[in-house]
């Protein structure tokens, strides 16, 4: 069999990528989160045929949805989509990969899933979020859901709010993002959790910060 070089887990499903860039999934698929075009569970890894002609470079699993980034910068999502966390512009579940559209100049470099929301980081160092947002976890200054990627202004060079962070001596982002699978999430510069006084992104509006022992981190390697 093929050697697996990447692995990510959702709640009850697993995603793996082989050394050749082929994508495999297995586990529970009630909401189509395996991406095989149906809602059938699989006990062993099955190749995602819809992406057989693409080389997968990054993967992430949400509670009931899955995201995959290909080597040419295309982002795909599938599975449970009640809150738009797949990013396909609708709220219907997807049992096959659906491409997530970004502005042409915003090539995706990283992706990470939360419980019911998703984050992406582009080569231009902009952060986009979509999915469940009623606890403020999308970082858009609103408590609404989004079914397409929306830039987080305050954390993105192309966002008008980024100047406010610069004036507060915010530290720059490194090449990795971490996401909690729950309502809380964090964008962590230099792989360090925000300290008191640092500017941090956070979910639940009652949280003053996201301390290390309060974040179950999911790592997306560059």
Give the location of each predicted region:
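Eukaryote-biased RCC1-like beta-propeller repeat architecture
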Residues: 1-222
């Amino acid at each position: 069999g093929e050697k697996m070089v990447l692995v990510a887990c959702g709640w009850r499903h697993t995603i793996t990528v082989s050394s050749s860039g082929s994508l495999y999934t297995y586990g529970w698929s009630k909401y189509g989160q395996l991406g095989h075009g149906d809602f059938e569970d699989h006990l062993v890894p099955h190749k995602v045929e819809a992406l057989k002609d693409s080389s997968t470079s990054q993967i992430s699993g949400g509670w009931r949805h899955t995201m995959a980034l290909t080597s040419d910068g295309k982002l795909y999502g599938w599975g449970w989509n009640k809150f738009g966390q797949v990013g396909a512009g609708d709220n219907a579940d997807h049992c096959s990969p659906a491409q997530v559209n970004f502005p042409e100049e915003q090539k995706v470099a990283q992706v990470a899933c939360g419980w019911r929301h998703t984050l992406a980081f582009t080569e231009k160092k902009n952060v986009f979020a979509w999915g469940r947002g009623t606890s403020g976890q999308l970082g858009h200054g609103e408590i609404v859901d989004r079914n397409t990627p929306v830039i987080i202004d305050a954390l993105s060079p192309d966002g008008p709010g980024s100047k406010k962070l610069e004036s507060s001596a915010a530290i720059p982002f490194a090449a990795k993002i971490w996401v909690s699978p729950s309502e809380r999430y964090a964008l962590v510069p230099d792989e360090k959790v925000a300290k008191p006084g640092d500017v941090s992104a956070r979910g639940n509006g009652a949280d003053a910060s996201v301390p290390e022992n309060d974040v179950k981190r999911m790592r997306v390697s560059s």
